[in-house]
UniProtKB/Swiss-Prot annotation:
Residues 8-93 form the IPT/TIG domain. This is Exocyst complex component 2. It is found in: Midbody, Midbody ring. The modification N6-acetyllysine is found at K454. It comes from Homo sapiens. The modification Phosphothreonine is found at T440. One of its GO terms (molecular function) is protein kinase binding.
Amino acid sequence: MSRSRQPPLVTGISPNEGIPWTKVTIRGENLGTGPTDLIGLTICGHNCLLTAEWMSASKIVCRVGQAKNDKGDIIVTTKSGGRGTSTVSFKLLKPEKIGILDQSAVWVDEMNYYDMRTDRNKGIPPLSLRPANPLGIEIEKSKFSQKDLEMLFHGMSADFTSENFSAAWYLIENHSNTSFEQLKMAVTNLKRQANKKSEGSLAYVKGGLSTFFEAQDALSAIHQKLEADGTEKVEGSMTQKLENVLNRASNTADTLFQEVLGRKDKADSTRNALNVLQRFKFLFNLPLNIERNIQKGDYDVVINDYEKAKSLFGKTEVQVFKKYYAEVETRIEALRELLLDKLLETPSTLHDQKRYIRYLSDLHASGDPAWQCIGAQHKWILQLMHSCKEGYVKDLKGNPGLHSPMLDLDNDTRPSVLGHLSQTASLKRGSSFQSGRDDTWRYKTPHRVAFVEKLTKLVLSQLPNFWKLWISYVNGSLFSETAEKSGQIERSKNVRQRQNDFKKMIQEVMHSLVKLTRGALLPLSIRDGEAKQYGGWEVKCELSGQWLAHAIQTVRLTHESLTALEIPNDLLQTIQDLILDLRVRCVMATLQHTAEEIKRLAEKEDWIVDNEGLTSLPCQFEQCIVCSLQSLKGVLECKPGEASVFQQPKTQEEVCQLSINIMQVFIYCLEQLSTKPDADIDTTHLSVDVSSPDLFGSIHEDFSLTSEQRLLIVLSNCCYLERHTFLNIAEHFEKHNFQGIEKITQVSMASLKELDQRLFENYIELKADPIVGSLEPGIYAGYFDWKDCLPPTGVRNYLKEALVNIIAVHAEVFTISKELVPRVLSKVIEAVSEELSRLMQCVSSFSKNGALQARLEICALRDTVAVYLTPESKSSFKQALEALPQLSSGADKKLLEELLNKFKSSMHLQLTCFQAASSTMMKT
């Protein structure tokens, strides 16, 4: 592929030499159209693209990298021009090593300067450092190239701190022009530096030796003075003298601080008096403080003050204290009543309930406030449940066509199953299942279903706190530590007595939940005496299977949530029973609804026939049942703890009967379609499969179906149902654990075969009777007489007309279903052969020519339809031939054979249909 631009050309670089990481400016031609066009930049063989900055088509700025080559070209590569060339080069210099004591304007990477094998993990002591100029003479850099020196001293180094230090290299590099005298002076300097290192520490000690001796003399003099003073007897020993001095100092101190200590004692007494006054002030102000704190809601402060006052003045005998303490008790009693009212107030949160119970416990309230709270909550939950039902019933009577406003889906914090309804209850059964449903269908929830959703939401919002309150009551966490210690024995006795009472409360809540749900969804399952309390919905129509499935999901989620609270299973058994009854009812309703849908399938028959002679009706029937069973998948599935829907024999029998009814309803639809008058057939949408052969012949023009054609289509559908559809449906029933599948299949197959045989006989009667009826008039047309007739010259027209009519039947059946051709033609030929045998047996006698003519026509018919002969038709042909006189001469046999060949040759085109189908008929 030719490039649109010339290759890049580098004509200049500034600077043209430098150490690694030197910033350079590259100039040239065709250096790229932009930053993205630049794809390569190498200097001395090193890739510098990462540091490259494209400025223009003639300028690039970058930094030189750590190249291996000392000198090399600058190569630029672009997308538009490819790999370029260079007319200039860049020289890469080796960086000079900076000594460890040398000043540097940049940060030195010591990893590249020193051998870390010897210096790893240890510092360099100051005395081991070498000066930058160890010889002490002027350094003069040599003019020898670094490369030449490296080649000369291979593997050595000019660094005097290196292990591979080479003195010759160092002298050539730094002192190549130094004279011999100067080098001798340098040796002297080097020796002097070595001596300084060994003499340094010794000189330090020698310089401070006189100081050490002076300190030693001073310490010895002090020691001798103390020993001399201790032996003198002036006013006793030195220790007695010291004791007298200390005693005088103590007396003097007491005299000086006597006044201060007196003031301290007075201050202490005053402080004690103020403390006593403060103690009384607390009691005097306590009634007012209690009222103020109660108004502010600071009950903790009130309780603490009360406990404090009780400990201080609870047993006082002072009258004034008794008076004020009595007022405190009055205020506290009022507080107890206030807290009890707040505790029994509904609705309230679990946190508030625990708080009020703890307050009352700390205040030593009489009775059992916690149990009173539990009882109040129980009544409140029952009241809410019944009020919810009354509200929905009232709303239903007032606005029967509207969705209940009480179901607030948006504010429901519990996981709602309405969101899953489209997955669990949607039945994709064609347009009939989706008709009239728009995006707002979920807001048209039936009132009874919405009530169950609201009822379960209500129970799950109240019962957990109710259960947790009881658990806290049992384990004593509702009460404070002091109250627990004081009333532990009495409370444990109350808990044992009230366990049965609380169990009855839970049972009553579960009973109400189940009864209210049954009243809404299963009104026939509650007794007449309970209908007013739990029912009253005035049900006009049963709920559909999809809404029952949704309600089942709702109740299941409720059961799971209650189980998570660790409520005993025996208390939740009524909910399990409800779920089972709902599942059974849902299955029944869905199957009944499916039967209704299948009954309407006849209206959808479009009579469009495919290559196999089938319409869409069998497929629609199977799809309808499959969708119904799919919608029941979640209902039939057993959740943990649930029983099978089919565990009861009665349920098995009812489901089996409904399944049989579904199959028989469809069979009835087929029968109705086969006998439907022509005027009732809607042919406006009639069509045929464009890939099929010329179906129906001339009917394409007027788009009309005859009753015979409808019979054939229904017969073809019946065959497909027997061989495929019914067996597939049985597999689907078995997949969903239906019981009595063999019975369903046997009864359905028997009904289908009965319909098939009846329709088949009707069709044969319609087609065979005209052909059979035309034989006798055709045989005796023109006053034909078997006793007196001319020698045969060929097959007469009546037989040809009969064959043409049989061919017409073949064509009509073949256009609908190839598989029906052998069955239909075999029966038609049986009827024709039977009639022909009867006619031959009725003839009293035959002449020679008559016998030959009859044998010719019988053999011609038999040979033509040989592939469709059955044992019955073969027997009829045999009887017909036996009724004829036997051929006596070979000339007659030869004439018969010639006439048969002449007949087959003349009607070869008409008889081709029988020959073409021979292989298929043999297989069939």
